[in-house]
Amino acid sequence: MTQFTTSQQAAITHDGHDVLVSASAGSGKTTVLVERIIQKILKQHADITRMLIVTFTRAATAEMRTKIQTALKKALTERRHELSGEDRRHLANQIAMVNAAKISTLDAFSLQIVQTYYYVIDLDPGFRLLTDETERYMLQERVWDDLREQLYASDEAPAFEQLTANFSGDRDDSGLQDLMFELIRQAGATTDPKAYLEGLATPYAPEKWEATFSQQIWPRVKGQLLQIATSLTQASALANQLPNPIWYQQIQADLAPLQTLLETNAPTYDTVRSVLISHEFAAWSRISKGLDDADKDTKNAAKDLRDAAKKTWQNKLAPTFALAAEQIGDLLREAQPLVATLANVALKFEDALTAEKAARHVQDYSDIAHNALRILQQKDPQTGAPIADNYRASFDEVMVDEYQDISPLQEALLAAVSTTTPGDRFMVGDVKQSIYGFRLADPQLFIHKYQTFQDAPTDPAAPERIILAENFRSTKNVLAFTNLIFSQIMDPEVGDLSYDNAAALRYGALDYGDAHPAVKVLLYSKATSDEDSSDASELPGDADDNEPVDIATGQTQLVLAEIQRLINDPDAQLWDRQAQEYRRIHYRDITLLTRQTSQNSLIQTQFAAAGVPLFVADTKNFFKTTELMVMLALLKVIDNQKQDIPLVAVLRSPIVGLSADQLALIRLAAKQVPYYDAVTAFLQAEPKTPLAQRTHDMLTHFFNQLSHFRDLARENDLVTLLWAIYQDTGFLDYVGGTPGGSQRQANLQALIDRARTYEAGGFKGLFAFIHFITLMQKQDQDLAMPAQVDPDNDAVKLMTIHKSKGLEFPVVFLMQANKHFNMRDQTGTAILTKQGIGIKWLDPETRVEYELPQYQAAKAARQNQTLAEEMRLLYVALTRAQQRLYVVGATMSGNQLTSADKTVEKWAAAAEGEARVLAPQVRSGATSYLDWIGPALIRHPQARGLAETTIKPALVGDETEFTIEIDVNPQVTPTATPEKVSDDSGTMVDLSAWFKKAYPFQAATTTTGFQSVSEIKRAFDDPDTIDLVNADRFLGPKPPMRDLTAPAFLTETPSGISPAAIGTATHLLLQLVDLAKPITMASLRALRDQLTTKQVIAVDVAKHIDLTALIRFFETDLGRLLLAKPQQVHREVPFSMLLPADQVFEALADDPGEDVLIHGIIDGYVSDEQGVTLFDYKTDHNPNTAVLVDRYRGQLNLYAQALQDLQPKPVLHRYLVFLRTGTVVDLVASGAGK
């Protein structure tokens, strides 16, 4: 039975009021939620159909329903005899009712409301759900195009033209379109979209400017002033320690005006501006007389703090107050009508979009949610009571999972169906894992309740906060590392929440073993400390997807090296929590987490080159498959055949099949014209060569097909056109015969399904369909289903942090920690927030663009939101790890790779300050995860080897174990590029003649072009071989069958142990024995027992290894040679080589010129100044040495030839070591090797 903690038990049992459960990562929140439901049913006879249980995904809904039903069945089975008859019937009834319970997503619950009460808002119930983002976008695009034309032709044209000019570029008006779509999306997340849009222009009213400043701008400015004051106060305290008061006086002069402002109650814009523009930071005094080294360090530290304050002053405050109040008034008088026009157009667009959806009988999920809220606010025609009351009366409790991801609209829906006095809501989530801002989730809703609800309130009706801090997922160091970072970077100012003792993770997984591996930070760095050039004007995030390939490759190589170490190192182990023992690490235990998928291709390439299996969970490659690219190119040509790139793609594809030579021949017909015109010219000319004639015929056939397809496209639907293409070209059948054929055919079928869905949405026409597909590609939409992780697939997993939420992995690598945050949405002509809009106003006469204060406020708000969400993403990434955690990045300056010492120096400067939490300007100025992690680590005792920073008092005694490993330009072994095979234009042939012709190389069909020595060994009867293939065809002396004694491990021993297993174990012992130490019976037993303990060799097999035979071997001349030169001994050496086929297969003696690729593994060789000594172990029982030498001569010859190819030294000796008899034969000395 599960043992719950005190806080978990409280979350399970406390009710009669609203309960907010703040459940940290790995704290078992879903288990608690399910247990709460079970306990209510078991102990309170609650009815599950009177509970509303909402989650955020359909998968989570199905999982919860299953868990509840399973738990109830288990309770009925285990407690059947102790339950009364009534209790058993109740429990059985609840099990049956689970499928009917209201366990659903919020979208599904909203849909149910609409489908039940559609008539009270006059909604047509026959609507179709508009779930495809691209289809929704196209619908918006069509409505916007119509509205735009109407506006250009109306009396509002001048105002609309100015609107377009202000928010669009010089080339087109897509900027205004994008802004309009985003406005509608932002408004859709509110409870009243119309009110949101109507209120956009209010903050721009000149007469309300001071109110706008006081409510929206001054709070931000005050926060920045407090940051500056904090830095200056710290600098002042340092300067006061110096013998000369000049620096203290300078800092006090800087502090005085700030303190005056901060003490002023509700200062006006002019008051603040006058102080800011009138104050100048005096030049820092360079006096050094009378200062010892410690004083100089103190002085420099004070200067650094003052410089940081000055930078914030100049870079963040000054732009906000660049204009005088009179100038702002003038600009607002110009800007307010512009914003009013924008709001007016947005309202018209929203109305037109609603009308179009009604005409098409479609509703998206935002429409459904708003309609559900409208319905809940209406009265029931039958009872006259508010419909919301009907729902409140039907639910005893409303339970919400993942509450941190709620939007204001969803919160309003939940509030409408919940009881308020006392509350009946149970909300569980973790605001530190709120990472769906792009879906307009509002974590402030959770934070407000977190800050206002009480821990253990005395009033039984008061809302309660319960914190689940115990983490049952991760080892101590993973949790300590996470706490170490977040206790220094997250607070209400930057991060929205204080990461205090209540928020910190606590170790709860007491079943882990003793080992808690240290967290590792792996950094790819530059070798020298040369000055790096970087574009200071480049905004953070501008080059987010353009990280230099060599930097990304370097980081990937670091990861690959560490993965190979983990896999190969027997001491690198994981604790198996089920078996309660340590085990080796497998590839499937390892997961790579990335912020984005932009480097996935590069990572896949590097892993493939290294031979490390990789499973990519975030696959979006439907439109990148060859068959889809060919089909899309053909559709474009059918729509417009004068498109060069699609036309050439189709001509080169299997649909037409022209070679590169044929394409060049066409181009020669007309060199300086579009390719379609060159094709036309070629077809009009008389073919003069067989190749030209064949090309002419192929083009003629294709253009006849193309004409037919164009007719079909005009007269029929898309599905008919696509089926005709598949049938007439045979393309569907063709791809079925290629590798992965069934999947390729499924992809082509999916294209037809997509076309059918597209036309069902009311869209028509090939051109629009092509545009639809193009939009899907641009918006990163895909038809391919997300790949599912196969637990039996032994491969490293690669996925985004978003995809990993809710999952856990034994080993986690957080990749690209140096990658810039994406701040691009803070640089446009307009920035949207939940409060409204900030715009840049473009003077139509001077074309000068002004950043209005409202824009500055919106920009700051958006930046804070972005940083807070990035911080939460980092938290999610770190807390996915169960036992081993790696943070991987590069030492960067801007977008340039820099040296480690520069990066460490930057971290040390950022870590200044006595407070545990890093300075606000350091955290708000971060552009990557490393900008937070580095300063947080550099001030820790374990980082003393990197920088001589002062260990902060708050970190003294911190037991977090981590290492920072810096690799300077790791050597990347380039992958060999296969030689390109030239295209063969070929000629037309008579296929019937082909079928009648006798194949001249019939013998070769009974062999393979790729042979392992294990297959060829049959010619030599190697007893190490288990799989014997085509033995009668191998070249070499074939002893009479009567002389063939079965080798030792092809027969079974009396003990029942396979001789093959004994032979393999013997070889393994010889491979791993330490030749640098004396070989004794005790050392061999110790090695055997070690391999047995690690389960490399089975215990019953180990007992049958003949250790005496091994001792006897090392007493021979060859054995003593190995012991004398251990550094020059090479064991288990793989090789591959090409041999003429007639040297391997007797049947091919008459077919010279053919080659066979041979691969195998040599037992070992010794290389010294004179040459190479080759040796190979055998375990035959046959005492006839002459027969054995004859049997293995060919095999040793192959090995010797391979060694000669691998290295330049001659092979002087070829030893066969017969372990059973203790005989060592040199084939060269005996003459048997010839």
Swiss-Prot record:
It comes from the Bacteria. Transmembrane segments: none annotated. Keywords: ATP-binding, DNA damage, DNA repair, DNA-binding, Exonuclease, Helicase, Hydrolase, Isomerase, Nuclease, Nucleotide-binding. GO terms for cellular component: cytosol; DNA helicase complex. It catalyses: Couples ATP hydrolysis with the unwinding of duplex DNA by translocating in the 3'-5' direction; ATP + H2O = ADP + phosphate + H(+). GO terms for molecular function: 3'-5' DNA helicase activity; 3'-5' exonuclease activity; ATP binding; ATP hydrolysis activity; double-stranded DNA binding. Its EC number is 3.1.-.-, 5.6.2.4. It holds the Pfam family UvrD_C. Residues 2-475 form the UvrD-like helicase ATP-binding domain. The keyword Isomerase applies. GO terms for biological process: double-strand break repair via homologous recombination. InterPro entries: AddA, DNA_helicase_UvrD-like_C, DNA_helicase_UvrD/REP, P-loop_NTPase, PDDEXK-like_dom_sf, PDDEXK_AddAB-type, Restrct_endonuc-II-like, UvrD-like_ATP-bd. ATP binds at A23, S24, A25, G26, S27, G28, K29, T30. Its cofactor is Mg(2+). Residues 507-806 form the UvrD-like helicase C-terminal domain. Heterodimer of AddA and AddB/RexB. NCBIfam families: addA_Gpos. Belongs to the helicase family. AddA subfamily. HAMAP family: AddA. The heterodimer acts as both an ATP-dependent DNA helicase and an ATP-dependent, dual-direction single-stranded exonuclease. Recognizes the chi site generating a DNA molecule suitable for the initiation of homologous recombination. The AddA nuclease domain is required for chi fragment generation; this subunit has the helicase and 3' -> 5' nuclease activities. This is ATP-dependent helicase/nuclease subunit A. It comes from Lacticaseibacillus casei (strain BL23). The gene is addA.
